[in-house]
Amino acid sequence: HPDFTTSRLFVEATDEESGCKWTLYALREKTVVGTIVFTWEDSIGSLRYTSNDEDDQHGYITEALTSILSYLARTLLLTCVYGEAGSETVWRRNGFQLQANRYARELHH
């Protein structure tokens, strides 16, 4: 999985046994502002994030998710991904809908 840069973030990818962990660094502050972890188990892709800014008031999680969701759709050809843990506000803001007890988002290539 690739590292990438957005207008405000450098995002470092670390491959893990069951997926990938992206560490988000704010370019200006040069500090870690969060992580997003993608796991792939039993043909199901799931995302989790951690942040000091739980509701993503600064928009860093949303900014990184935009690129990550595009990558998952175009490169891995996933059609759906689930959001687990984190804030309902963040998942809904990023196009996820509550299904059963987790958030789901369809992906289009």
Task: List each language-model region with its residue ranges.
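GNAT-family acyltransferases
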Residues: 1-54, 71, 75-86, 98-109
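Conserved acetyl-CoA-binding loop-helix of GNAT-fold acetyltransferases
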Residues: 57-74, 93
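Acidic, divalent-metal-coordinating active-site segment for phosphoryl/phosphodiester hydrolysis
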Residues: 87-94
